[in-house]
Amino acid sequence: MKGTPSFGKMNKSPTHVRCRRCGRNSFNVRKGYCAACGFGRSKKIRRYNWQNKKVNGLRLV
């Protein structure tokens, strides 16, 4: 069966499980990589500057 009836079965299994590297519940089972740290996609930890809030124009780390 495909189409609309199949979409009701999408919530049975979890999309994300706990990541081995960062420990957060962000590892996508189907895609095979972590949305938080990038484990499974790259050796480098996924990190962006916009993750930290700017205060007075200076970026806090």
Curated annotation (Swiss-Prot):
Cofactor info, note text: Binds 1 zinc ion per subunit.
Cofactor(s) listed in the protein's UniProt record: Zn(2+)
Superkingdom of origin organism: Archaea
Keyword terms: Metal-binding, Ribonucleoprotein, Ribosomal protein, RNA-binding, rRNA-binding, Zinc, Zinc-finger
Gene Ontology MF annotations: rRNA binding; structural constituent of ribosome; zinc ion binding
Zinc finger annotations (C4-type) as residue ranges: 19-37
GO BP term (any one): translation
Pfam families: Ribosomal_L37e
A GO cellular component entry from the record: cytosolic large ribosomal subunit
Keyword Acetylation set for record: no
Transmembrane segments: none
Matches recorded under InterPro entries: Ribosomal_eL37, Ribosomal_eL37/eL43, Ribosomal_eL37_CS, Ribosomal_zn-bd
Binding site for Zn(2+): 19, 22, 34, 37
Function: Binds to the 23S rRNA.
HAMAP family: Ribosomal_eL37
UniProt record similarity statement: Belongs to the eukaryotic ribosomal protein eL37 family.
Protein name (Swiss-Prot/TrEMBL): Large ribosomal subunit protein eL37
Protein's organism: Sulfurisphaera tokodaii (strain DSM 16993 / JCM 10545 / NBRC 100140 / 7) (Sulfolobus tokodaii)
